[in-house]
Amino acid sequence: MTVDNSFTMKKFQSMEIIYVTFSQITKLPYVECDPETFDDQVYMFTEEEAAKEFAKSYVEKNTPLLTVKVLRKQMPNFYMGLYAEGVNMVIFHEGDQTRRIELEQIFPKPDMEKMNKQHLPVLNPGVQLTVVYFLQELRKPNQRRDDAERMQHLRELEEEMLVNLMRSKFILAIDISQVQGEFDPANPGPDVRIPYIKNQNEDIFQPLFSDIGEFQKFRPDPQAKLRLAAIPFQHLLPYLMKQAKQNPHL
């Protein structure tokens, strides 16, 4: 059955604030797979208190949620983030009414072919979605280690995540500001540098990016001349710095 959401769309376009349910585990919008339609959906509210009450209802499910305010000027980037996360459906709560709205009805889906002229992964929704589902389940508090059904579910989520990782490309940043003449990717030479992050303990972390959006959040030396390379997951190892550590929050 087709639902006419035109009135709701007009309200969306005029709203100054929406409230969104986020996962405390991933710090991203909380995503659920609808058991009947298999839509990957998020929850939005017009009222902050309603969003908070919804979050409280998930406490008994051992699913810690929080309510995040999204301002009108933030909405385009927020909706792009939902596409990056693999979301296709919004459950919109307005007062005592609840509507299911396809994300494409709220914000147009980006033209991936047009955006991907450089063959860089503009979005990696398959990876992000399966990682989100895996982490949301893996880090649930108050779980029994001898729960065989849950462990089987975790193995299935992990397997799906790994399949998507193996199929994906990741963005590697290369600093060529010290290279003399033309840069040759096949013969990079000693003047090519790999950007890294060092914390207060002198630990080194090498940034890899799942998509362009994640790269844009990274702010290296503004004087650095960076070249982006799309590397298949199975070919990443030769590019990784030996002294780099794994992110302890993963």
Please state what every model-predicted region is.
Residues 1-250:
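An interfacial alpha-helical scaffold signature
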